[in-house]
């Protein structure tokens, strides 16, 4: 077991030596930079050299490539990524030498206590987009925020930012109850669905985690009042609602058919007008969540309008990649049936002749647990190409393959490798089509290869 959060506070002070195992990771890299900015001596290690490790080295952080026991010598404490298990030589060395060991999420939880405003954006879907939208708003408002996003944001040329202001914004994930280590002053809940069922037992178990998260917030909760699972989860708690229905505290009026243009009403008063570049009802909801948080923080409506006007989407969220043989090619991170539903509905409004989806399921446990839901949503494609399941952190202990999906979806095609996906797409794409590479793994490579 890792030491408790309270114990970590004594180590996150100027002059202490903190070593980060897996420092090149998407949320470890900004963590290292924030700790350095707080006056700590930061070192780290990662399995491979990368753009991330190069950036850290350029900023004066010593990074060792490869995990070795000697890397932890002299450290006052160790912070590890979730991917660094107890058999990692540095973790084993820390344990044997009695060096205090902490999780990444615990460190973020301590850090955010130094900020007047700690906005933690959670939900089964939409976290990266909503956190990115919030970042655009706060940057436009001159708040100089510190930001941690689970994806790349062009505005930042990164997925993170270390600011000098009194506000920190974090994408907050429920997996392994990670967000229960946080200390939000404002908790945002976008939606709740059954997911990460390799950790949670069922939907009720997921809901329990989100309720605990909401109860952590010291200055309010903003939640989707249109989502029945959210409403059920928060029963008996006070919170501010956002959503499309007029009963919500924050809701739209005069909304366009493509969900991109509308006025926002907050507590029965006009707050701002939005002209979004991103499409779909799901993105209108993401925007309303960000607007509600900005309103609660006292951000002027004009800054919200201008901030979201420049938001063109986060990396791998309906990202336009190019055109092949007259067909537009997009990439999207959707890896849950509800996300697939939202993506397909949004693309239908774009009036293409055919929607061609190349889908790569993400993790065996999710594919098994949500099998029937995947069949229902994937069947809505005009043409479906299935890549093999992306294992991520798992081994195939449940005996499932994309071939099982293919057998249940008439007309679908199975490709064992990504080059086979690309080759097949070349044979079917034509003018008037849209090609979507979809999934949280590396399916985007199939689309990129198509455009070369």
Q: Whereabouts are the PLM-identified features?
A:
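Short internal beta-strands
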Residues: 40-47, 220-225, 357-360, 382-391
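A glycine-rich beta-strand to alpha-helix segment
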Residues: 420-451
